């Protein structure tokens, strides 16, 4: 993607499909490679785990990871790639999300719908969902929850709108000057 001119990329792996140590090492090596070759690491790293869906039973996969191992992965990604945004979805329960936010997860979703047309007004059938959502709270409930934990939720997309992507974003982020761009 970067060789084709895309200057801002995110990485991710669906944990549970393969041995997690292999996937974890691979994502860190990929981040390191992007830095070495392009001078820019990943803007984000997403850490979803395989979850139940209409035709998927996670117990049939022998590489699932428990909550404690998942939390360690999140903490180690934060240490290894401190400048990246780390994303966790509503695949995870409120309890797990609360734990990993404290370990460095910086972006979470709220009130997510995973089915085709899921955000339309009408009720959609559950058998079209990509995966079962574990945290079913409304967006307002998620925002209030974050505030009660002492966080300031933000929906900011200014960096993208202002062209602060790729090497421009990375320079601000690594020097910790990005905070001076946020008001």
Residue ranges and their predicted role:
Residues 36-183:
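Auxiliary Fe-S-binding modules of radical SAM enzymes
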Residues 7-8, 85:
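Residues at the starts of beta-strands that form the adenosine-phosphate
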Residues 8-9, 153:
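Hydrophobic beta-strand scaffold residues
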Residues 1-7, 14-40, 50, 57-68:
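Conserved non-cysteine loop/helix-boundary elements of the Radical SAM core domain that shape
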